[in-house]
């Protein structure tokens, strides 16, 4: 098996079973194309989400190192920070979160509801900064301060997007390949591409398991020119650690994230409402709504390689709906 080196990396079991892969019949009728969804929004801790896959590897490494504190960073409404804090609470670890307000809002819901509310419930230590200009360096500075207070910190990068964290989505590719055995002629997989770990892990895994399937990353914060080097760097780092080659091109669409990261747009919100009304599935305004807008528009614009079924990776994020009210 080409991915057998995955077993070399310690993994903390947090998810327990493959997440569902479901056909969306009513949504499929809308653009006239078979659409499936991988439900990583229903992972079992703290309202779900994709970051749990990365945390299985990252937190296993933290425990191996004897850490008693997890430190990470993100936006006030970060799904990654929420899931990291929840795992810390579950394991009896301290969690410190370095947060920014990337959209510069004073809206009370954004500042106090949604993911931010959950951080308080998980007893997270919050540290605010004006902007995450160099998050890796800022996290190291914070870790030094926390260590001086007597803690044993472990730094988890923004989005959990290191080569180690991204192993969670190489693992996910194994699940997808097994679950898609009954999906005839799967053409494409669509995923939101942000901190790049989910995208890069899937790129490595699917290249070796489903080489004929096109993987599209819909950017949520950067242009193709800015995002592609980030995905490629992680893709190559992952492949190196797994003793694999990674030659698949990285496909990105950057037409759907404007006006910027964390700012809802009309197409994304229409996609959120469409999935809710047709399938009872909740997307979010920051990641999956914009990615689904790209999928739907990509069908209408004939941007996919062929007319076969499409799989959408639902990375979660529904708690942010409450933070973005009344835009929802």
Curated annotation (Swiss-Prot):
CDD domains: ACCD (cd06449)
Keyword Lyase among UniProt keywords: yes
GO biological process: D-amino acid metabolic process
Listed cofactors: pyridoxal 5'-phosphate
Enzyme superclass (EC): lyase
Reaction(s) the record says it catalyses: D-cysteine + H2O = hydrogen sulfide + pyruvate + NH4(+) + H(+)
N6-(pyridoxal phosphate)lysine modifications at: 51
EC number: 4.4.1.15
Sample GO molecular function, one term: D-cysteine desulfhydrase activity
Pfam families: PALP
Classification via Gene3D superfamilies: 3.40.50.1100
Superkingdom of the organism of origin: Bacteria
Keywords attached to this entry: Lyase, Pyridoxal phosphate
Known partners and oligomeric status: Homodimer.
Family matches, as NCBIfam families: ACC_deam_rel, PRK03910.1-1, PRK03910.1-3, PRK03910.1-5
PANTHER family: 1-AMINOCYCLOPROPANE-1-CARBOXYLATE DEAMINASE-RELATED (PTHR43780:SF2)
General function of this protein: Catalyzes the alpha,beta-elimination reaction of D-cysteine and of several D-cysteine derivatives. It could be a defense mechanism against D-cysteine.
Family designation: Belongs to the ACC deaminase/D-cysteine desulfhydrase family.
Protein name listed in UniProt: D-cysteine desulfhydrase
Organismal lineage: Bacteria, Pseudomonadati, Pseudomonadota, Gammaproteobacteria, Enterobacterales
Gene: dcyD
């Amino acid at each position: 098996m080409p991915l057998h080196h995955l077993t070399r990396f310690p993994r903390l079991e947090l998810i327990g079973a493959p997440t569902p892969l479901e056909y969306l019949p009513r949504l499929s009728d809308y653009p006239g194309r078979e659409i499936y969804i991988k439900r990583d929004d229903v992972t079992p801790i703290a309202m779900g989400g994709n970051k749990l896959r990365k945390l299985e590897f990252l937190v296993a490494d933290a425990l191996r190192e004897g850490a008693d504190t997890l430190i990470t960073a993100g936006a006030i409404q970060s799904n990654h920070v929420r899931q990291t804090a929840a795992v810390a609470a579950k394991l009896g670890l301290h969690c410190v979160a370095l947060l920014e307000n990337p959209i510069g809002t004073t809206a009370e819901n954004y500042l106090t509801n949604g993911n931010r509310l959950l951080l308080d419930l998980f007893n997270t230590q919050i540290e605010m900064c004006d902007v995450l200009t160099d998050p890796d360096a800022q996290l190291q500075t914070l870790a030094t301060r926390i260590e001086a207070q007597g803690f044993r910190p472990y730094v988890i990068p923004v989005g959990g997007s290191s080569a180690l964290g991204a192993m969670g989505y190489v693992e996910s590719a194994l699940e997808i390949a097994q679950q898609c055995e009954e999906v005839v002629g799967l053409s494409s997989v669509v995923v939101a591409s942000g901190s790049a770990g989910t995208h890069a892990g899937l790129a490595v895994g699917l290249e070796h398991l489903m080489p004929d399937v096109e993987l599209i990353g819909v950017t949520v914060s950067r242009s193709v020119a800015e995002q592609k080097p980030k995905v490629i760097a992680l893709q190559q780092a992952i492949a190196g650690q797994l003793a694999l080659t990674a030659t698949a091109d990285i496909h990105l669409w950057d037409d759907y994230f404007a006006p910027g990261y964390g700012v809802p747009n009309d197409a994304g919100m229409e996609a959120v409402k469409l999935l809710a009304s047709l399938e009872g599935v909740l997307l979010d305004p920051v990641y999956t709504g914009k990615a689904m807008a790209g999928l739907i528009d990509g069908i209408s614009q004939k941007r996919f390689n062929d007319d076969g079924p499409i799989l959408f990776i639902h990375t979660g994020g529904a708690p942010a709906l409450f933070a973005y009210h009344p835009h929802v």
